[in-house]
């Protein structure tokens, strides 16, 4: 099974997928999807379309010149089967893939190195040249005032609820004390009435 690269965007064309165009001179052009086929028929330049691998490599966004990439070239000359050769090739393939991924990560990290500083300086220059960007608009001020009022009302309501709860507790305790006093008085009256009767 061979996985071909799309002639236009260089993404993989798996078996049973995509379109193949064969020119009069028997040259084969494989496309991963109809988007690439249409662009090819319109004679679009892949280096000028930002979503193609050709653009990314030409613009320096991806690793273009590296020894690990030479291993991925097509070899149409068949080699006589040799078990040891196949074993060493499979080992080498996994090792080369690891090295390529490591180099790509390093390339990306190096490319993105100064972005934070650049963005900060650009934003700073923008704010310095347009100070009105930092000024709050009337609508935002009104919203802020409304939020503050809502917070104050909520805190006032909480205070009212707490004070009501405290007053209820106090009134309950007073009512209990009055009941106890009444009970004591009733007991005293009974004792006195008994004494009087005898």
UniProtKB/Swiss-Prot annotation:
Comp. bias intervals (Acidic residues): 154-177
Location of the protein in the cell: Cytoplasm; Nucleus
Pfam family for this entry, one: Ribosomal_L24e
Keyword Nucleus applies: yes
Gene3D superfamilies: Ribosomal protein L24e
Chief site of localization: cytoplasm
Family label: Belongs to the eukaryotic ribosomal protein eL24 family.
Role according to the record: Involved in the biogenesis of the 60S ribosomal subunit. Ensures the docking of NOG1 to pre-60S particles. Activates and recruits ATPase AFG2 to cytoplasmic pre-60S ribosomal particles.
Name by which UniProt lists this protein: Ribosome biogenesis protein RLP24
Protein species of origin: Kluyveromyces lactis (strain ATCC 8585 / CBS 2359 / DSM 70799 / NBRC 1267 / NRRL Y-1140 / WM37)
Name of the gene this protein is made from: RLP24
């Amino acid at each position: 099974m061979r996985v071909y690269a799309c002639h236009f965007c260089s993404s993989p064309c798996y078996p049973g997928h995509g379109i193949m165009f064969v020119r009069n001179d028997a040259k084969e052009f494989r496309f991963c999807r109809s988007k690439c086929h249409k662009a090819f028929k319109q004679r679009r330049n892949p280096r000028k379309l930002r979503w193609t691998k050709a653009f990314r490599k030409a613009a320096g966004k991806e690793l273009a010149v590296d020894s690990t990439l030479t291993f991925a070239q097509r070899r149409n000359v068949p080699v006589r089967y040799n078990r040891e050769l196949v074993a060493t090739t499979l080992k080498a393939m996994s090792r080369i893939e690891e090295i390529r991924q490591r180099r790509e990560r390093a390339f990306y990290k190096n490319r993105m190195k100064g972005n934070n500083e650049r963005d900060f300086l650009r934003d700073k220059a923008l704010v310095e040249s347009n100070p009105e960007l930092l000024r709050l608009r009337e609508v935002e001020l009104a919203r802020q005032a409304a939020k503050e009022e809502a917070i104050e009302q909520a805190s006032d309501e909480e205070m009212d609820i707490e004070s009501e709860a405290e007053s209820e507790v106090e009134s309950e305790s007073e009512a209990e004390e009055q009941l106890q006093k009444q009970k004591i008085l009733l007991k005293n009256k009974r004792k006195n009435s008994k004494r009087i009767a005898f």
